[in-house]
A protein has these predicted regions:
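Catalytic core of bacterial c-di-GMP phosphodiesterases, primarily the EAL and HD-GYP domains
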Residues: 26-28, 58-139
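Surface-exposed amphipathic alpha-helices with a cationic face
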Residues: 74-78, 114, 141-149, 198-205, ...
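Structural preference for long, well-ordered alpha-helical segments in enzyme cores
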Residues: 32, 52-53, 66-74, 108-109, ...
Length: 252
């Protein structure tokens, strides 16, 4: 299997996409995105190995690999004196499952960051609604609350695309809401999508949550999000996902 071979041969790697404070334009962190390097040197995205995430044990192994790589990169930047903000990682439903002989997700994240001498502020956790709907996950709400209590920021990813986003927003514990890029990309040409983005931002403010807009690609979208009071953004307008070696991480 492609994913198993990638884990065995160390072919999985992380690319990093910057996250920006929309009011100042300052970079506040990165999202780590999984990629696979093929023998010919080309790099492919997760759609090529998405089937691996349907297998709980394999998916958990991949998630643990992503955590280790993100923590190692955060430590490298911190050691070099780079003010990188944070690295956000996506967590799958399989990672919430307790397996014999393996630490629970909370202990795994805490252990990895502490061993690297990092603060919880250096690593963020992003969870999609698909994880909430999955029957594979364990006591997700309790684990998310434990992460927040320990000082980690938890984000509700791809908000607005699921079947029960509002229900899960009420039932689970989050610090940030990430607006799905499909709404952001359509908002300047569609009054309906603009209204949806505005409603999400207003709701988040009322709940005391921060908002991240995904998929920001144009200056018009940036201006519209600023006018609505969106806190943060990420997308091709600010930078494409790229390897750590190709990133410009020194102060502007």
């Amino acid at each position: 299997m492609l994913a198993e071979e990638a884990l065995l041969h160390g072919s999985f790697l992380l690319h990093y996409q910057p996250k920006i404070a929309l009011d100042t334009g300052r970079r506040i962190g990165f999202e780590a995105l999984l990629r696979l390097k093929k023998p010919d040197g080309s790099v492919i995205g997760p759609t090529a190995f998405s089937a691996a995430f349907d297998e709980p044990i394999l998916s958990r192994r991949i998630g643990s690999h992503v955590l280790r790589c993100a923590v190692a990169q955060a430590k490298a930047w911190a050691t070099a004196g780079v003010d990188f903000g944070h690295i956000a990682i996506n967590v799958s439903s399989s990672q919430f499952i307790g397996l014999p002989g393996s630490p629970c997700l909370v202990d795994e994240i805490l252990g990895a960051t502490r061993s690297a001498g990092l603060s919880p502020r250096h690593i963020q956790v992003e969870v999609t609604e698909g994880v909430m709907l999955s029957e594979q996950g364990g006591d997700i709400g309790t684990q998310l609350e434990a992460l927040r209590t320990a000082g980690f920021i938890v984000a509700f990813d791809d908000f607005g695309t699921g079947f029960a986003s509002l229900v899960h927003l009420k039932e689970f514990s989050y610090d940030q809401i990430k607006i799905d890029g499909s709404f952001v990309r359509a908002m300047t040409g569609s009054s309906a999508d603009h209204a949806i983005v505005k409603a999400i931002i207003d709701m988040a403010k009322a709940l005391g949550k921060q908002v991240v807009a995904e998929g920001v690609e144009t200056v018009a979208e940036l201006h519209a999000l600023r006018e609505l009071g969106c806190n943060y953004g990420q997308g091709f307008l600010f930078g494409r996902p790229t390897s750590a070696s190709d990133l410009r991480v020194l102060p502007d």
